[in-house]
């Protein structure tokens, strides 16, 4: 059967007219499937609750930092008894492709937090615009986020596009997760507040956890990578001096996608991995935050990404998280940290920020 379909497809694509017919049929079939698997469950949910709320753009990809953000958002919504419907980014793109993005119009929309406003991840920013434009009658919250635009001709042009669309919406609220993004967002958008990264609302310290051992190296390898090969070699040299061969590499981005059902299981595995280490060495934002919430000693390597240092300011008072600008300080900082026996993570100082966010959501939920 597969061979027959392939043969038909090849014949169709050799003819311009047949190709158009084939693509049209494929689109119709895709739209029917989209309506069955995505649209109908949304319609059913909308009928089942008095106040529909949509948590959207959540991950199904491999980045555990993004999953931890979504997980914390889910916990927050549970704490304020808000019944929500989750739509992942993958499903959102499908809804958009088949013209169903406005199915959310008129209802409360919560856009997943992270570091994706602006042009660092342009496809995400463009989808944010589409969501805002397609749902003019919704109240929309963009949960704690970082923003970045290059000071180039293209960066300035894209910023202007976003400013027009964002500021044209009558009920859009934005939350910045660090001061630099907050100041910039306040200068270009209305209704902006400062709230920490959502993962800082979690506390994953376990007093009775197993004995810690060795060093866990968690470094970036994507477009936000800033360490050179020589700098990585220098880091490894210092780790060898302190730990010998008792170290291993890890990452907050796995080698496989993570479904919403797998989210908590995979996060628990990663938190356990962090808890079992004496020291984390990272240039990843959520490498640092996972270390903080699990009470794990951590050396944070400076990055050209402002969100890392910006978010560090929230936890700079934690004696077990050290931010270094100069690799020559690595060994000294490492030995100081290893003298720590038990670390405690107290996130009560963030309560007023998260309570403010909850209050804002509840206000819209009850209206």
Residue ranges, per PLM feature:
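Active-site anion-handling motifs in enzyme catalytic cores
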Residues: 2-367
């Amino acid at each position: 059967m597969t061979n027959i379909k392939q043969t038909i497809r090849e014949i169709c694509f050799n003819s311009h007219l047949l190709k158009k017919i084939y693509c049209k049929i494929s689109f119709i079939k895709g739209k029917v499937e989209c309506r069955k698997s995505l649209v109908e469950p949304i319609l059913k949910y909308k009928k089942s609750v008095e106040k529909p709320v949509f948590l959207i753009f959540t991950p199904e990809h491999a980045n555990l930092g993004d999953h931890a953000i979504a997980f914390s958002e889910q916990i927050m919504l549970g704490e304020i008894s808000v019944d929500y419907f989750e739509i992942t980014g993958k499903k959102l793109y499908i809804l958009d492709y088949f013209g169903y993005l406005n199915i959310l119009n008129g209802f409360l929309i919560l856009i997943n937090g992270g570091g994706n406003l602006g042009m660092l991840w342009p496809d995400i920013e463009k989808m944010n615009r589409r969501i805002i434009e397609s749902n003019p009658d919704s109240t929309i919250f963009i949960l704690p986020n970082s923003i970045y635009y290059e000071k180039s001709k293209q960066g300035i042009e894209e910023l202007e596009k976003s400013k027009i669309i964002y500021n044209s919406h009558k009920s859009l609220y934005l939350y910045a997760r660090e001061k630099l993004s907050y100041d910039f967002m306040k200068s270009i958008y209305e209704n902006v507040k400062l709230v920490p990264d959502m993962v800082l609302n979690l506390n994953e310290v376990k007093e009775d956890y197993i004995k810690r051992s060795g060093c866990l190296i968690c470094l970036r390898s994507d477009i936000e990578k800033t360490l050179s090969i020589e700098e990585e070699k220098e880091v490894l040299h210092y780790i060898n001096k302190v730990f010998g061969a008792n170290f291993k590499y890890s990452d907050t981005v796995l080698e496989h996608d993570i479904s919403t059902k797998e989210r908590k299981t995979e996060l628990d595995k990663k938190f356990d991995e962090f808890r079992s280490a004496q020291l984390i060495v990272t240039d990843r934002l959520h490498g640092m935050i996972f270390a903080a919430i699990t009470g794990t000693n951590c050396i944070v390597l400076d990055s050209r990404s402002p969100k890392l240092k910006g978010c560090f300011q929230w936890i700079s008072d934690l004696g077990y998280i050290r931010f270094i600008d100069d690799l020559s300080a690595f060994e000294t900082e490492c030995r100081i940290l290893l003298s720590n026996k038990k670390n405690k993570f107290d996130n009560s100082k963030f309560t007023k920020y998260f309570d403010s966010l909850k209050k804002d959501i509840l206000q819209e939920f009850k209206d």
